């Protein structure tokens, strides 16, 4: 509920009878005087279920309206109502972006009614009569509807109609110079100088903004047109040069086309020449054919006598050959008969020799047998003597040897099993030793490695981060774009600062990958996030300058900011500054005194604390400040835990000691295993020595067994030899007892019979030799006659062969020429030439006839000459530029050149027109802007003298109109230079003072119907606040100025007031009358609404 003066005491006095005198006048509701309101100013605002209000009304002054009240009572709700009620965007307020969030809790519908003073500038708006003094705009916000309902004078309209009305009234809710909410004060300080000029012009004279926009547009058009014109002029020069080149190419092309025409004409002439050449060749072929035919007939006539003689000789050779065959048979039979006699004689001679040998054998047989018997008997006796001397080993000896051999084999098997067991144990120990050695090497390497990726093996939830880091390392394109986590790339100078850093950086950020810019984020974020569940942090351009200098921090008892004791990748450190604010956290390894801590939690003169978080000793202190009421400050602290992260080295000293101890233990284990292995090796050597001894014993036994086997083998062989000699001796004795004298006599008789048979055969052979001689003589005579006849036949064959070869050759020539002449009469080539000739039109034939007649007269109408002409033309044409596109390009260049020569003068005129318009608009804008800014600067300087050292407003006018800007220059110390107002150089209170004074300086020049400033005095000290308040009151309450709204949560004593200003005190509480129950109470305390009759 809003109130100006509490009239309750007057009502109470009447009820108690303290003033019972009859009165001639009584209090009644007064009708407001609207004549003092400027067109477009706000007369009244009525709110229902809006933010903190259930139902309230603001009846406003046409000059300064100062809205005061405690924090949370609903002062800024008035600002929200003005913005949203006039169809403004929630962004202009700087709070929630959803309109439905402004509906009071527990309600579904909210209503804003704003009554404005009508203006002559309002035209063509439905439901608004120019005769009406006021315009009522109603906005109904429903939680369940996306769009609000709007009414003008209780008639429903669209939002665009309301926005049109607001624009016609020159209400600029998006202009920080007119509408500055509490949340957008800092935005005004960050407002760029170019934008500040635009907003200032809009507040004062919107028509000048149109001129500025036109100048910017004209300048852009001028630059674009000038660039285009320069390009076209250069293009004209280029095209003219290109045109000259193309004309030469066209001339070459015409020469090419002429030669091409000649080539085409001679190509068409070729069929005629070829037909002529073909006919000439055909006549030559016919003459050759006739000659071949005559030659063939002549050779056949010469061949006939020789053929008859050949036939007679062939008959004679045949008869003699038959006779020779018969004589040869007779001769062979006689020769065969003699051969048979020879064979019989040879057989008889062999038999005689054989019989004689048998006689000799039988005559000397008895002596030989006796000698053999004596020799065999001697061998037999000698073998018996040797056998008697040989001692055969006993069977038990061999059995003893077998037993000893089995014992040795069993013993060897046992020892080999033991050796196998030792080898198995040794292999296992070797495997363990290699494993221990690898572990020791790995741990030794971990003590010296610089790669911190091992940190990611400490926890299971870091496995995804480790895999993501490895993938980034495998992709060179991600290098310097995706940075590894802070726990790998950043370290503190010692363990205590590492614990500080771990306490201030949340765990998700400590393991997050840093993306250096938005382009890299767009390029690589999805490939990483699709594969791994990791966090990404994108670097921004946010400022990371510490809030106060390092010297101040040290004066307060700290060693510096936490960021001062951190090293590593600068970009990752910047990310930690932006996300965890480590550049704003002062640290001290010793604990601060209570007095030092009390000083830190005490707000500064501007009401704000210096640091929101500090670290001292082993405590982290968060200092929080309430946003409402007295803005109470309360600290909370927590103990700082030790961490394994952010260490200067990859591992802590404890980890190093632990790993070194593990390495020592591994070495001891390795030596123990080695000792065991040495013992096993010695044991194995003993077993191998035993095997060697057993092998030696086995060799001795084998040698003994071999010797015994050899004795047994020799005994058996000797016994067998004796038996064989005995049998042989018996056989010889039997043979010696036989009588062979009769056998010798029989063989002598057989020899006599054979010699008689031999004499008979020799007599028969003499007779056969005589017959053979006669047959041979007759055969030789017949063979001579046959040879002579065959020689004559062979000679005749040579003669006939010559005639046959000649005949075949001539016949082949005849057939070939006959066939060739037949084929040449109508060849496919000849037909194609004729078809081509017939395809020519009459004009072509006439042209060709003229050329042919010319060549015929010159004696050159032949294929060779025409072909030479074609070859020459083709050689010449190959040297000629025949780019057929040259004509087209020349036409295009000519057309383009003609068009450019036509358009360039017109563009030059247009450019001059634009330049003239620029000059004209510049002459209009610059003096007015200079005058406005000069007046604003003078006004601002006068106002600023009361709170600071000096202030000024400058209009910067570079060549580019888009860069024209206003710069607010201030200084708060006499020896300091003027500096531009921005969000970095000045403190919050200094920015607030500068901002409000600039807005006050605009007051008398602005054309806006009203201006709103919400809690601009935050951060000011009481002196500056009084000075600013006085300046604001004096300017806002001056004549012919726009309506002004100032919202503030505090009200100092001794402020300057003016009779035209109105104070609206916003109060809340259970004791406040409820206007929903008693509608009259909504006007309770508003003295401006009462009059006395």
Swiss-Prot record:
Q: Which residues does the record give as ATP binding sites?
A: 69-76
| Domain of life of the source | Eukaryota
Q: Name one GO cellular component term.
A: Smc5-Smc6 complex
What Gene Ontology molecular function terms does this protein carry? ATP binding; ATP hydrolysis activity; damaged DNA binding; single-stranded DNA binding
Region Flexible hinge, annotated ranges? 442-650
Q: Enumerate the UniProt keywords alphabetically.
A: ATP-binding, Chromosome, Coiled coil, DNA damage, DNA recombination, DNA repair, Nucleotide-binding, Nucleus, Ubl conjugation
Key word Nucleotide-binding present: yes
Q: Which InterPro entries match?
A: P-loop_NTPase (IPR027417), RecF/RecN/SMC_N (IPR003395)
PTM comment: the record says:
Sumoylated by MMS21.
Tell me any Pfam family this protein matches.
SMC_N
User: Subcellular location, in the record's words?
Assistant: Nucleus; Chromosome
Q: What is its main location?
A: nucleus
Where does this protein have coiled-coil stretches? 208-354, 404-441, 651-757, 884-926
Gene Ontology BP terms: chromatin looping; chromosome separation; DNA repair; double-strand break repair via homologous recombination; recombinational repair; regulation of telomere maintenance; resolution of DNA recombination intermediates
Further information: Present with 892 molecules/cell in log phase SD medium.
Subunit annotation? Component of the Smc5-Smc6 complex which consists of KRE29, MMS21, NSE1, NSE3, NSE4, NSE5, SMC5 and SMC6.
What does this chain do? Acts in a DNA repair pathway for removal of UV-induced DNA damage that is distinct from classical nucleotide excision repair and in repair of ionizing radiation damage. Functions in homologous recombination repair of DNA double strand breaks and in recovery of stalled replication forks.
Stated family: Belongs to the SMC family. SMC5 subfamily.
What domain notes does the record hold? The flexible hinge domain, which separates the large intramolecular coiled coil regions, allows the heterotypic interaction with the corresponding domain of smc6, forming a V-shaped heterodimer.
In Swiss-Prot or TrEMBL terms, this protein is called: Structural maintenance of chromosomes protein 5
Q: Which gene encodes it?
A: SMC5
